[in-house]
Amino acid sequence: MKVRIGVSLGPAGTPETFADAVDRLEQAGVDSLWLPEMVYSSLVEPFTGMAFALSRTSRLKAGSGISVLPGRHPVLVAKQLASLAGLAPGRVLPVFGLRPAQDAERALFAVPEGQRAAVFDESLALLRLLLTEESVSFEGAFFSVSGASVGMRPARPLDIWLGGSAPAALRRVGRLADGWLGSLLTPAEAGMAVGVIQQAAGEVEREVEPDHFGLSLPVALDGDIPDALLASIRRRRPEADPATLVAAGWDGARRMIGQYVEAGLSKFVVRPAALPRFGAPDFFPFIDGFVRELVPMQD
């Protein structure tokens, strides 16, 4: 398995600081930049940020981590991804999820009541057809197209990754996706998730490539988990010890990544749990530490 470790900007991903942060990542030779979907925030929107970052760099990959698919029309999403892949071949890393992380944003991605999972499944099926077929005719419960084409298809089909950690989400990865990016799971839990995904894939006679399993890992550089992140963990994982889900400094990050690799994961998105003043200059020491402490773990 090829271990690769990318970076999410965290609170440094605002328009005022984004360009400087992207330039620093490129200069430092970081593998990839990941952009979360947080509409009610000052963070750059993922597809906009990906286009900007890819146009400004020549090596850096860019991923959406994680964008909401249900509530978006898959034809429009396919057009965006095909355009990005045409402009920056081999550097586009789409990851999709079922719903936004913030409850307040769910109304922005409207789907029929009680049908979000079904819409997600159908959206993924249509999205993949549009990215691989010259002309697509599709009649589903939620989407219908006839002779649809986005006009350009990636020379190599894009790998579509999904997030999520619920059993149904993991089985969806096995049935419909090319990879998985989890979060807030212990190494043991992540290893079990890999097993669930591969079992679901086998049931439909497919396989997720062994090196297509990853995790988003927050790093608390001073060892203290910020209150906002702590509240989020307690909301999502009330039974879990937060210290098992957040790396305490770079030593903790190296140790945890090693444990995740032993559990069968090889792709990681590391983000700062907090930054002093939420600006790009404050992010630069994080990048320097990341390059010094974590990049040598790649192979």
Locate each region found by the language model.
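Active-site-adjacent structural elements that line small-molecule/cofactor binding pockets in enzymes
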Residues: 1-299
